[in-house]
């Protein structure tokens, strides 16, 4: 797995960034209006090699890949470059491919002439808006099965005021022959697909910069005596959107990798990247402008320039919703697409051979060792705990793949650990019982007494006992540091009194990991201590609490419960340090595997259900909504991959784990609702089959945004650690 650029790509990106910071400043962008073209900037880009980046070397270009071109476009988007760069890059490659008019190509690469493209077939759309046509010498266009170069007259090059002062023009191609180019129509179509990715990259760069400007302003502007970035009404929407902006870049990368690998998803990936970035850019700039308040509406502040370009750049193609329709047809109606040459792509989402081996080992276990009767009890919650399967996994050495080698006896790479978790989820048995017990085993190993290590730890490791967590309390919820359950020294041990809420699995577990208040005279986070408490101890009461997710949790009461001091974990009042040991098991996880199964159920339901005499899967609105769910799934997986990659490779981590959890849980919930709507009223049924599965996923998704840290907590972490906003929590 890799999310890093090559050294050469880093150097190239930095070169373009420095050049554009100086030559596409906001002052230069403003000066280029109303025509929207900066000829000096354009010639400078040519000198930097930007215009020749996709032209083969034997035609005088750099011969670089599509990925390299998107790096340029990301910087161009960040600086609102004044000129039809995405269109010119595609036109230059097509002109070079045709071998026609080498003199014109030479002037294009030198920045002395502009050639652009018409995005729609002029045989069926003879009149259309063309980006860059107000300053271009010629337009490359498709006319049915032919590709032609149409020279523009002075009368065509008529600058026209438009939404964002970009150099577009409305061209009537009726009756214009144009010079034939030796290019197949499929090659031209591939150029349009390339344009979609280039403009997507530009929009992603624009989106990130608009959020950066908004965050910087929110960190210096004060209202009511506080920086406005401390208000969650400001910081939380920005946290949502940085996930969408980052996701836009990753969708572009996925599409390029899919093209390079020949994936059947490649065409749909292009459409989804273009749709997503068009929508996300509009959302990002709108929220960024809102952050500036009334000042954002004035022309004195640069944010309005981002707002206008975010809409203008993609709309030259048409309604972005059509791109989602296109993705739906490519995913579910067999529509194919001509795709451009990708070139080298450094990004890789494969986990490697050791991870593949771990997956095969777990697959073999579930195939040979798990009976149908055992499998029938599987469930995403604690209710799916099957003691016999748990014990067999322990005997096979597969129960706790996330534990470090010094405890487990066999060191696994982080990627193999990830693959194991994914494989369990694939088989429906990534059970909370094992995950929580794994965490408790690690804490005992690190902080437990000799007695705990001798008596409790072996039982956990051998699959003979499981543990639950006693963190939350009725009055504190996610604020674990507000715990009031007391542990009072008594003789050579402790007396525990209090209540814990959402002690899931306490009815099944032998032990509970307790966070207790041991000191009320210090800061609340400093007066906590960790204990292991046997749930069969006298004074412990477990009372069920049922949720509408088909899941049981518990409220547990501790009345004069006595344990020896040897069952304490770590130092007295050192509970926070003890709890931090569990961070070694942080996987930056999300809900991608559940989302994938939910999408599969949605597709299956749409194949079964008919509306107006036609299967739902054949209807455009159904295809588009399934495609939107697929987009959210792909992004959830990509954001999670990045979170896991930075952990494995020890890279800078800008709250990537919280981003993965928050984004995936929120989209899991919205898509679960939408798929129920799409398949209604059949989706009301709990008959065995895909609609029953959609019901279950809808119930499951309700809690996804709550447990493991609420979305609100994660949004605050993202705002602070990724966007640099002031701390919003006490």
Name what the model sees in each region.
Residues 1-82, 326-434, 455, 459, ...:
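Amphipathic, small/basic residue-rich leader segments at the start of a protein or domain
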Residues 2, 16, 71, 90, ...:
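Glycine-rich phosphate/cofactor-binding loops in nucleotide/flavin-utilizing enzymes
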Residues 2-12, 50, 77-78, 158-246, ...:
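Glycine-rich beta->alpha junctions and the first turn(s) of the following alpha-helix
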Residues 25-36, 215, 223-226, 242-276, ...:
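C-terminal helix-coil-helix/basic helical segment that borders enzyme active sites and/or dimer interfaces
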Residues 83-99, 432-451, 477:
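N-terminal glycine-rich flavin-associated loop
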Residues 110-123, 141-142, 463-471:
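A short, Trp-centered hydrophobic/proline-enriched beta-strand micro-motif
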Residues 118, 125-162, 168, 497-541:
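A short core secondary-structure module
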Residues 485-488:
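A structural signal for short hydrophobic beta-strand segments in well-ordered beta-sheet cores
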